[in-house]
Amino acid sequence: YAPAFQPSQDDMKKIMQGRPDFIGVNFYSPTLVKDDPSQPFGIANRPNPDQYPSYNGPVSPSHLVELLMQIDKEYDHPTLIITENGAGFGVDDEKLTGNRVLDPLRAKYLSDHIDAVLSARHAGVKVEGYLFWSLLD
């Protein structure tokens, strides 16, 4: 911070009592772990077979629902915005047909994750926005 910025004690009390307008959530894929004392930190990655693996890792929209529900519970029902969600699937998914790129795995990924967000909303989680990972998603 700038040295000239010295909030007063009253300002700090107001800041600490405040609540953010929203919490931004970036989600691409889960990292699943299991207990393994022989590994550093006592954990090892756990395989998660999925129907269509991405460069990002396992595709698992249900883990997005779990994450949103956990944030909702632990942070007293904040407003959430999915600020990034997407995946890359590579040349196996990107077929050029005329002047169109057909990428059914990316489309399915996005559709499944939007459905996951809607499931969380139907369960009462205040998700107010959803942004794709990039222009190409």
PLM feature spans:
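Non-catalytic scaffold segments within catalytic domains of secreted glycoside hydrolases
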Residues: 1-137
